[in-house]
């Protein structure tokens, strides 16, 4: 039997990422053959990964990488926040983002077939990572954005990489694009414009807003405060020419009833119409980037600010770790017990 030296164990660990004991056992089983040991570790890793396949991985990191006129934002999941801070995990995320940006896959299936620097497919690299790190590690999703030479990327990550954003700005500069991505990270828009919102979605969100008003009115009634009116509209898409004309007519009637001279109406009506638009586009403000108040200049919406600097936003992508994943709510004792059981089974 070949002698299993510390040097041999170290070499195998460097090539496979395996722990000391796993590397030593693999070398013993393969009589010191490095290549056979790597294959054995890979097979064992696949078995371990299979055991972990049904676990929920809702923690993790986003990765952002810009490659010339192509940018990628990705999400990679782990089971715990602790592992998400692991150096090997962070390197895997960053490498994956680079491979995605350079490979430009059309979907997750193509992404998983891309070749990593290690020579493995992306899919195999994640199986290996699951075995080595000891938690389910999964590549969840990616977005690719392309720009022209005249456009600018804004790449930004927030909260230690839990949020990743890419935006594209036309006729601005990289600094503006970066600021816009910071806004997107903080304010969570889901689409660019009200034109992208589904009609039924707007109706449902408006109903929810009015439900909140009803709850607020119950509290106001208890302290003899006047009730707040329901919102009639939630999006600019609902504000037809007839609706806007009627709103202006109502304002004029109100001014006449108050005895305001007609000669000053032109100074009052624009402000009241702005208020009408603000009050009746609450859904837009929550979900569309252009309608949101810009965090870098709260006197303007994003759309108004971009117009003031003769720029426009073309596209954006925002990923936040764990969006849409249902995470099991285990108590601490159950979590410890599960961890110990997993350790015994590995």
From Swiss-Prot:
GO molecular function: translation elongation factor activity
Gene3D superfamilies given in the database record: 1.10.286.20, DNA helicase RuvA subunit, C-terminal domain (1.10.8.10), Elongation factor Ts, dimerisation domain (3.30.479.20)
PROSITE patterns, alphabetized: EF_TS_1 (PS01126), EF_TS_2 (PS01127)
Stored InterPro entries: EF-Ts_dimer_sf, Transl_elong_EFTs/EF1B, Transl_elong_EFTs/EF1B_dimer, Transl_elong_Ts_CS, UBA-like_sf
Spans annotated as Involved in Mg(2+) ion dislocation from EF-Tu: 80-83
Lineage: superkingdom: Bacteria
Keywords: Cytoplasm, Elongation factor, Protein biosynthesis
Location of the protein in the cell: Cytoplasm
GO cellular component: a single term: cytoplasm
Pfam families assigned: EF_TS (PF00889)
Family: Belongs to the EF-Ts family.
Task performed by this protein: Associates with the EF-Tu.GDP complex and induces the exchange of GDP to GTP. It remains bound to the aminoacyl-tRNA.EF-Tu.GTP complex up to the GTP hydrolysis stage on the ribosome.
Name of the molecule in the record: Elongation factor Ts
Organism of origin: Streptococcus pneumoniae (strain Hungary19A-6)
């Amino acid at each position: 039997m070949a002698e299993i030296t510390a040097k041999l164990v170290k070499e195998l660990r460097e090539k496979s990422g395996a722990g000391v004991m796993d590397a030593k056992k693999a070398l013993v089983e393969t009589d010191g053959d490095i290549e056979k040991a790597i294959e054995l570790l890979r097979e064992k890793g696949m078995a371990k990964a299979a055991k972990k396949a049904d676990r929920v991985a809702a923690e993790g990191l986003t990765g952002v990488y810009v490659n010339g006129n192509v940018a990628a934002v990705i999400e990679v999941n782990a089971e715990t926040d602790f592992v998400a801070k692991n150096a090997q995990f962070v390197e895997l995320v960053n490498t994956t983002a680079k491979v995605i940006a350079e490979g430009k896959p059309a979907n997750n299936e193509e992404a998983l077939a891309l070749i990593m620097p290690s020579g493995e497919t992306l899919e195999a690299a994640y199986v290996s990572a699951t075995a080595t790190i000891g938690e389910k590690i999964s590549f969840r999703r990616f977005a690719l954005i392309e720009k022209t030479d005249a456009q600018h990327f804004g790449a930004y990550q927030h909260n230690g990489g839990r949020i990743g954003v890419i935006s594209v700005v036309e006729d601005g500069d990289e600094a503006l694009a970066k600021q816009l991505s910071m806004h997107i990270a903080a304010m969570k828009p889901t689409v660019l414009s009200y034109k992208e919102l589904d009609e039924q979605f707007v109706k449902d969100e408006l109903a929810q807003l009015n439900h909140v008003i009803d709850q607020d009115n119950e509290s106001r009634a208890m302290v003899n405060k006047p009730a707040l009116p329901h919102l009639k509209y939630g999006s600019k898409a609902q504000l037809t020419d007839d609706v806007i004309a009627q709103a202006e007519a109502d304002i004029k009637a109100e001014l006449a009833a108050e005895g305001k001279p007609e000669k000053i109406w032109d100074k009052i009506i624009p402000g009241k119409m702005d208020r009408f638009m603000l009050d009746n586009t609450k859904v837009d403000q929550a979900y569309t980037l252009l309608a949101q108040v810009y965090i870098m200049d709260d006197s303007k919406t994003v759309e108004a600010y971009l117009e003031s600097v003769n720029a426009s936003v073309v596209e954006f992508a925002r990923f936040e770790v764990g969006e849409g994943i249902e995470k099991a709510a285990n108590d601490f004792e159950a979590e410890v017990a599960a961890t110990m059981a997993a350790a015994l089974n590995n």
